[in-house]
Amino acid sequence: MATFRNNHMKTKASVRKSFSEDVFQSVKSLLQSQKELCSVTAEDCLQQDEHANLTEVTFLGFNEETDAAHIQDLAAVSLELPDILNSLHFCSLNENEIICMKNINKPLDISSDPLNQSHPSGMLCVMRVSPTSPRLRIDFIFSLLSKYATGIRYTLDTFLHQKHQLETTDEDDDDTNQSVSSIEDDFVTAFEHLEEEETSKPYNDGMNITVLRSQCDAASQTVTGHHLETHDLKILISSGQQKSLAKPSTSSVNVLGHKELPSVKTSVTTSISEPWTQRSFYRSSNASDKDSDLQKTFFSSSPAYSSESECSSPSPVIFLDEEGYQKSLKAKLELPKIPVMKDDIEDSDSEVSEFFDSFDQFDELEQTLETCLFNKDPVIGKSSQRKGHKHGKSCMNPQKFKFDRPALPANVRKPTPRKPESPYGNLCDAPDSPRPVKASREDSGLFSPIRSSAFSPLGGCTPAECFCQTDIGGDRIHENHDSVYYTYEDYAKSISCEVLGSVLRTHHTNTLSNINSIKHGENKTVTFKHGNLDQKNKSKNKSLMIKDSIQKFAADLVEKSFGSAFKDLQKGVSSCTNALYHLAIKLTSSVLQMAFDELRRQRAFSLKERAISGLANFLVSEALSNALKDLQYVKKQIFTNTVARFAADLAEELVFEGIMEVCQFSYPQTPASPQCGSFDFEDKVVKLYAKDLSESVIQEAFIELSQVDVTFTTKAAVSVSTDNIKYVSAESVVPSTQAVTFSPSFHNQAIMVTKPVQEYKKEYTVQQALFCTSGIVTSIPVPLAGSALLPYHISSTACQAKAHLSSDDSNSNGDSAQVHIATKNREEKAACLRNICLPSEHNPGNQNDFKPTNDDIEMQSSSKLPNDPAIISNFSAAVVHTIVNETLESMTSLEVTKMVDERTDYLTKSLKEKTPPFSHCDQAVLQCSEASSNKDMFADRLSKSIIKHSIDKSKSVIPNIDKNAVYKESLPVSGEESQLTPEKSPKFPDSQNQLTHCSLSAAKDCVPECKVSMVHGSSLETLPSCPAVTGQKSDLKESAKDQPLKKHNLNSTSLEALSFGQENPFPHSHTFSSTALTCVDGLHVEDKQKVRDRNVIPDTPPSTPLVPSRASSEWDIKKLTKKLKGELAKEFAPATPPSTPHNSSVGSLSENEQNTIEKEEFMLKLMRSLSEEVESSESGELPEVDVKSEHSGKKVQFAEALATHILSLATEMAASHLDNKIIQEPKVKNPCLNVQSQRSVSPTFLNPSDENLKTLCNFAGDLAAEVITEAEKIAKVRNCMLFKQKKNSCYADGDEDYKVEEKLDIEAVVHPREVDPFILSLPPSSCMSGLMYKYPSCESVTDEYAGHLIQILKQEGGNSELIMDQYANRLAYRSVKSGLQEAAKTTKVQCNSRMFPVPSSQVKTNKELLMFSNKEHHQEADKKRQSKRNEGYFCKNQTCERTLDPYRNEVSQLYSFSTSLVHSITKDAKEELTASLVGLPKSLTDSCLFEKSGYEEDNECHVTPELPKSLQPSSQNHRFYHSTGSLNGYGCGDNVVQAVEQYAKKVVDDTLELTLGSTVFRVSETTKSADRVTYAEKLSPLTGQACRYCDLKELHNCTGNSSQHFFRQGSLASSKPASNPKFSSRYQKSRIFHLSVPQIHVNLDKKAVLAEKIVAEAIEKAERELSSTSLAADSGIGQEGASFAESLATETMTAAVTNVGHAVSSSKEIEDFQSTESVSSQQMNLSIGDDSTGSWSNLSFEDEHQDESSSFHHLSESNGNSSSWSSLGLEGDLYEDNLSFPTSDSDGPDDKDEEHEDEVEGLGQDGKTLLITNIDMEPCTVDPQLRIILQWLIASEAEVAELYFHDSANKEFMLLSKQLQEKGWKVGDLLQAVLQYYEVMEKASSEERCKSLFDWLLENA
């Protein structure tokens, strides 16, 4: 029994349906049903296009305990819902009733999926679920079943039919606009049917009404507001009969649809309650005309009307048809006289008002429908059949009958009264005047329509106002006579009377009687007394017969003539009135229509206008703001450019003048003269000079600027100058480090000129910041770097002076330089300049000092004096290095190279010879001064060369000068450089002290130098790498530097390192992006930092990516000018030219202080620009390298010397690093340790034994030669590539390193130690260095570093990829660490460090070496070597192509990242798992661990499946290495695996989720989302930017074992997307944003749109994934992020490990990565089964998703292998989905298959799709599993094609449904199984009872 209730919501109709016991019959049919189970999908997998066909039903369950609060909660579903429910008295529902409501607006709460907005909201079924009924009782299930069945069927029918009909019949929805005649026809037919059926179907409450046919009319379909105002209409719907129809217009619904579903029979009754009075259900004809079965349901009118009044016209407007009208006209008339009186004519206004009233009533469709009797008496042909007799209020033509008319003239007869028995008598107000028995023929109906309005209001007239109606006898009663009628009648009568009178003279009585009756007021009675007249006439004498006949004749005559006339007249009049009325109607309706249209149009127009204007305003404002921004920017640019240009010109002039001036100061001093005093004096002079100069310059500048068309106010000048200061100073700082070597004199001069010492101090902040940044670059904790720098400020100058004085030129330079560097770059500049200038003068002293060790000691003391001599020495070393580098660079032109070679030879010799004189050569190198004694000459030359450089900016000039200088000096400039080193170094070989000094130049610098030497050591380490890389760049230079450095190696190296580092500190920051972390920079910087940071052990120096160690002279000049600019700017800082230099300086200082922050920012920017410049210069430099290659022989010699030092130092350093580690070869260790201690500044370490030196030298020589050659080759090959892929530089270096490594490998056995340094030099990018897990400091460093980098990058707005990388690094690092810790906890496995025999001794040595060097690097090296050996040079063979890949850049970074990540992960994991690892298949763990390291290894690593064998787990430190050996046990301990899995999950999840998510979001905000997407799309095929690292790692790894591993893992993850939806979706989101990172400039509009799209997509996806794939709660993975993440990570990791294990074991011998790949892909499927957690194992992806890999195959087309995100647990398919936005095909793991099934299953169906949402109002006791199953059953029975569930917890159900479908279960089977389950459960014991329905079904399936 279904109740329609009016919810007073215009849009909703509710139907209350209840079920009789018949339901149980239908249940039987269900039990036997053999229908297929429909496919089930999570709502999230819904595709956009499916939403259109989607029918949605929501079941809302409540019970007795549901209270108001619960109901109010439903506001979340729909705001109106609580009110509707309450108004429906839903609480009164009984157990077998449900209420169906349509069109409940669904707010976002329910359909957060944006797709859901598009489809019409569905049905809401409210049902009572009484908790009292025992849950396991079968009848409870039946009642649930029936409720769901009714709701679902009702919904389907409603919506499907509605769709049908909206398509087929939506013609005449607006009934008021139908043409009148069609309405009339409608009702005619309707009433005829009614009449026929009325008798057979008496209307009663039990009346059976069937389901609507599909032809149900459109009126009912369009539910208008009125329809819904009905009150309680109960409709019983029974499926039995299809013939009759109950169609309440309120139900905008077809109950149960025309496709009757046999299984459920519901019977429905209809009853009507009181409020139906005066309501008419009005329905348009369309369907009803066509379908004779259709019936109107009529409801008895309100009790006010008698039962007789059973007919009322259903339609407000009814006309006679033409035929009836004709008939009415044929009736004979008696024509009265026609007195025309004003009163009798109703004014037209009243008619019009009536007309409109009739419409009002017409619109109230509340009048009840009343059946009308149709008089269908065929006998009465004459009488027109009034098709709808209107009675009561529904009269059709109610004309007010005016009873207050004045009396008719006496001769007019009264109308005849109605017969008393006339059915209409009771309707008349006329007095009961007697009625003559006989009705004369004149009574035949004369219908006078003249005054009757066709549109008189419905039911608005009194009973008397009816039309004349024929009574059964056919008599016509004329009731509504008009005045006209009376006039005619009287006229006729008077004429006839006169005629008769004239003939018979007997008419008086009649006339009198008429007059009397009129006087009596009987005119009200319309009675004709013709009968009496006739009788009187007849009663006359027979003699009067003639008269009678005459009378008759006259009467006939009159009748005929007048009758015909009147008939014609009547016809004309009526047609006229009809026409007029029609016209009036049409006019009014059209007028109204037009008016409304106009209103609507105007409103729309205004809205549109408003919208457009709003839009326009917005656009205009945007445009304006953008324009303004651009304008400002342009202005700024113009201004800056102008100022910059001016500054540059100025700087050049200044430089020239300044140099000239300075040259005057640089008069030679006698060695005896007190150098310190002169130095101080000169300082003052220089400062004063600088100030004066700056004043004049400033004045000139203002003059210049005033001429520029840029408005240049003082303020502007000030700001500009400050900016410049910041910019330039920053720049100069960088260059200073970089360019120091080139023209320290310039720097010194400039600095000296412009800055007083105090300034330095104040500026230190900026410089410090710079340093910090450089430190950051190298991943030194900022604070450390800062602290290191602080001491230098004050001391630097003193140190410099002393250093200069005390130590040799080189030393002094070095020290001072170091000091300067320490002080800050500026100081460096200043110091260097001073040093250079002064040193040139002091040189003799220095040289002298230098030669003797005493001098060195003095130096040390002097340096000590300043502050931290060690630091100073470091800096000095760095400076020296830089200087040397720069000089070498400047000399690098071809000629120079030759000289360099010569020099090299000379130097090497001198080194051996230990020629102290050359010490000055350091300065000489700087200055190319030939004779150390000729300080003046040296100074002059220096200044000249510098000036020339600055002026000419041409390398050629420099070389010439250099040559000259060289010749004079007898050393080429490069020679000089080398000389510098050699000078020191010569001593080094000769005397142990010198050796010590030389080696570290520490002896000279003593403690400081030791530190320096340490620096050197580190730098050496770096150098080795540098040589490899630099070899390309300027191997010669480096080698030259290094060789001379042999002794000074330390210094020079450190310098080099510094110089590189410094040069690149910026590049470095930049380099990240560009030079793949210019390893050199990284190394050097690292070294520096390490030096500063004694804690930090120099990790493997990243191979020097082509840091342009030797910038062209132009570069130097640029740097110089920059510095100058900086100084100038400082001077300028005071807006106006300072009145006194002091003031200006003070002002600048204060400003500087204020602007420190800005300066720092500037520095960052500066670093950036510098790095760019450096990079560009790098590209320039490569060719030079090639040129150098010509002189390979000399190079080799040089290389030997260099190599010896490098190797010794590097090995020593490495050894020192490793002291805490278990070193397999202690011998190697010792020297290394020394080096390390050196860092600690223990001079002892500085003294390598002669033997060591010799062996090292020999080995180094060979090595160096090879390195150089290799490097050159590589450089040549890769020049272009390198530059293209700056990031790749590391990679390239790596290759070189590989080659070197190969060589080393060969030699490694012999000189394992030596190998180390190179290994150290492996390309681990700087990021990696930070990640070294070994050193605790490093961890923090990495974090800080990453953070800082990120900040810088963000500020620079620069490379989003870099930023992401940093994030990823940091994140990965943290997550890995924490994950490992977690894993350790969970596993509780103690680390057993085991060493396994290494298959090849070589490998062993390598390994050991590796161990010594940073593990990661070693690993890489080992792996690389091994992989090279084992599988051929991977890069060469397999990945040469890849090398070319643009990805290489990323690859290197990836390696670094992955390495670090992998290392830490593997390390920890292995540690924790070692014990259990034994149980794991060797390959498994190894591949896992090694692969990871392998990633870094690059392609080679990829090859590493074999690596595991070779690698030995040397020590715990090398946990990563627990090589295959450790894993030999094949039994995988579940716990281990699980631990790994957990850890992996956690790591992955936390990492990605937390970091990437948040950071990415931030980042993405800055980046424009549009680019995001586009970029993402671009990326999608090959590079997953998501976690670029992981991606690339995987990509590259894919090729090799690691790739398999990842691939496998990824495939696992991807293949099991269902299991970790949450995680994947999370990832996915972050990934999208990741992708977005790369591009930065986007239009706002696009951005907004894009962002929306992306967000929508992401959310959609995420949701989809969540529902389709999230593990069911039972799987044990909590939904809380952490636990979930953990479990997920664990799973991922485990799967990965397992897979890898299989893959490795299977493919160990496979050298071709492709084969590995295939194995891995197979493995993917295998692993699914192995999954130890088992939560995924249920998903049988093997069959369903074999194409899964293909779905994201394109990710790694380059490898031919489907990459996976598994390394970080990323889901490949997700990634793909995001990128390729047509995701819908493969979002859910199940979708594809389901779709195919549906295609098969539902071909014959109309493809019904149903979305079911269940809402429980607390406390509701339906078992959700039962509910889902039952709904599924019903939907299947109803032949739904696709069933979607909104509940996200139905993962298990998805599984179950899949299995059941596969097993071929039918609806009946499933229902029986459910019933059986409950029966079993009733009998089962309490333990068994806990088994859920799904589980039970799965078991029994």
UniProtKB/Swiss-Prot annotation:
Residues 1141-1153, 1713-1740 have a biased composition (Polar residues). The modification Phosphothreonine is found at residues 981, 1100, 1485. Keywords: Cytoplasm, Cytoskeleton, Phosphoprotein. GO terms for biological process: cortical actin cytoskeleton organization; intracellular signal transduction; protein localization; protein localization to endosome; renal water homeostasis. Expressed in heart, brain, lung, liver, kidney, testis and ovary. Weakly expressed in skeletal muscle, pancreas and spleen. GO terms for cellular component: centrosome; cytoplasm; cytosol; nucleolus; plasma membrane. The keyword Nucleotide-binding does not apply. The keyword rRNA-binding does not apply. InterPro entries: SPHK1-interactor_AKAP_110. The modification Phosphoserine is found at residues 18, 422, 433, 444, 448, 1171, 1176-1177, 1242, 1337, 1580. Residues 1757-1772 have a biased composition (Low complexity). Residues 407-443, 843-864, 971-993, 1131-1153, 1708-1805 are annotated as: Disordered. GO terms for molecular function: protein kinase A binding; protein kinase A regulatory subunit binding; protein phosphatase 1 binding. Residues 1787-1801 have a biased composition (Acidic residues). It is found in: Cytoplasm; Cytoplasm, Cytoskeleton, Microtubule organizing center, Centrosome. Its main location: cytoplasm. Residues 1747-1756 have a biased composition (Basic and acidic residues). Belongs to the AKAP110 family. Binds to type II regulatory subunits of protein kinase A and anchors/targets them. RII-alpha binding site, predicted to form an amphipathic helix, could participate in protein-protein interactions with a complementary surface on the R-subunit dimer. PANTHER family: A KINASE ANCHOR PROTEIN, A-KINASE ANCHOR PROTEIN 11. This is A-kinase anchor protein 11. The lineage of its organism: Eukaryota, Metazoa, Chordata, Craniata, Vertebrata.
